[in-house]
Amino acid sequence: MTIKSNLFKCVAVTGLALSLGSVSAFTMAAEEEHDHGQAITEMQLNNGSKWGIDAPLSQAMAKISQAINAEVESIHADTLAQENYVALASEINTQVAYMIENCELEPAADAQLHIIIHDLMDGSASMENQSSARNGAVKVINALGNYANYFDDPKFQPVAH
């Protein structure tokens, strides 16, 4: 791993821990660090197959899915308390930081994962604001669905809704 890569991971994780206000800066830094030419903006399969995963990614996505699944009925009924949305956002941020810090994906799979990470971070930021909390949760649920559809993680349990 290069010094630049280690420094990027340290900065990214620290930034996540300090504030979600830096989501756009984090996303721009992530895109700059992993720029492999043309930016990918929509999910794609790997020549018709799902992308490979690593253990940290599987673990982090499972924890995010479990946290959302525990509250999905209240999210759908629009009865989830704001403090629960904030707690969910915190768990998402923790797990995203973990998957970034421990990422060992090949570059093409990593580029696809960045689309999901962007949606997770955007959703978690929205969940911290009462006026957009439910929409943020829906964005996270959609990101989890994309993970299930595009990454080969046989242990992953998508959100039941």
Feature-to-residue mapping (PLM):
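Amphipathic, heptad-repeat alpha-helical segments
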Residues: 68-75, 82-85, 89-96
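Immediate post-signal-peptide N-terminus of mature secreted/exported proteins
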Residues: 29-80, 159
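Helix-rich interaction surfaces within compact, conserved domain-sized segments
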Residues: 102, 113-161
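Non-transmembrane, amphipathic alpha-helical segments
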Residues: 45-57, 77-84, 105, 112, ...
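Bacterial N-terminal signal peptides that target proteins for export
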Residues: 2-14
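N-terminal signal peptide c-region/cleavage motif recognized by signal peptidases
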Residues: 22-24
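Charged, amphipathic alpha-helical oligomerization/scaffolding segments
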Residues: 56-59, 63, 87, 91-94, ...
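Short, solvent-exposed, charged loop/turn and helix-capping segments
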Residues: 95-113
